[in-house]
Amino acid sequence: SSAASDVYKRQHIDHAGAAKELATKLKLDIIGPHIDDNFLLQALEIQGQMYGMKAQNFTPDKWLNHGDTITFGNQILDIKHCPGHAPGHVIGINHKAKKIIAGDVLFNGSIGRTDLPQGNYQDLIDSIKKHLLTLEDEFIVHCGHGPDTNIGTERKTNPFLINA
């Protein structure tokens, strides 16, 4: 896929609520998340009503799968399926730049919520251990909310991961 697409690796209203409107207006394809989150994308309108926002349900033009790559110019994101916050959550890892687009999987000092529909705490911890804690300490984590962090800091100080 390319930068001429609208990429959504997250599926809740706070991340994907305007996706359909933007894609239509800008004439872009929508890529992602993983198909396991289709139920959330088909409930965006209802999610929006709960928060007084307008949102349109949509089906992506292409779903993201574990092992896919997304290219932006000369930057390549390696897609990893990381269920837990949501069953179809994916992250993007740029190995060359040592950067991660983590969405709502890992935060500075915390982890994503698992109390939302089909969230699963153990799946989230397993995803983090398998796909993030295996990376070098200097990998920068761009979180879906809040300040950036890095793998080394989270490995040493994140209360959810210290004994994981």
Language model segments and positions:
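N-terminal low-complexity segments that are often proline-rich with Ser/Thr-Pro
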Residues: 1-2
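Metallo-beta-lactamase
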Residues: 46-47, 75-164
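Active-site HxH/HxHxD metal-binding segment of metal-dependent hydrolases
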Residues: 5, 9-71, 156-160
